[in-house]
Amino acid sequence: KTSSKTLLGKMKTNPEFKIPSIGSEGFYVDSDVWYLLMRNIQNQVNTMLIGATGGGKTELVLLACKKLGISCSVYDMGSMYDPVAGLLGVHRLQKGGVSVFDYAKFTRDISKPGVVLLDELSRAPVTTNNILFPCLDSRRKLPVEIAGGEDLREIEVHPECCFVATANVGVEYTGTMSMDRALVGRFFPIELSYMPPEQENKVLVKRCGISLSDATIITKVANSLRNMYNKQEISSSISTRETLMVGDLVADGWDLVRAMELVLLPLFEGTRSDGERGIVCRVISSR
């Protein structure tokens, strides 16, 4: 039993920290994960959410920030091909040939209270690490050595700024960089797994407006394929994002089986009778 005098006890009794519900937000999160994330954000503990893609990691962080009433600046690290320009800034020529350093938005976001979300950090270029290291350790500073003249060369991270990262795991995620142990070690890891089937059923019913029987079949097929992926029988898993896609098609009038085929089959190679795609077809037909 949790004492009401501890931080966890206070959060559990405070309505402001209420766990998101399927009924109100259409979102399910394990209570331990929720309170741990809220505690870390409040205490400015760098946190990394680790789990399969499409599992709601980004949405979870946005929900937490909304509950806490703080800003959340999202950075898509997977598409940041030039980390120096994206995180520090660039020199721009003004009239008369004068060079002015244009600081990146990141430098302003870390200078104010709130959460800086490094989304899909596992897909970021390796050069990102050296830029982020001083921000994430006890220094809490961002060196901007490329700024010239009298421009500010070092930016302090605001005491109430918290870094949260998301990372996809699994060999099927193309573009995923092998994460530097020194980078991972600067974060508090929180692992997210797929939600229990009965909860995923409720999410599908709530968000898509489909029947419980259809939702149950979608979840059953998805979990069968997830189990096969865990056994390395197929090369890709099925995310909640994809089960929601199926649910939306069913809600819009597509036949349940056809909806599953349209969403799930393109994720796998082979034909309807051979290869991984054939395996998926058999799982769908044996629902």
Features from the language model and the residues they span:
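Alpha-helical lid/collar subdomain of P-loop NTPases
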Residues: K1-F27, N43, P196-K202, K206-R287
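AAA+ P-loop NTPase catalytic core and its hallmark functional loops
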Residues: K1-T216, K220
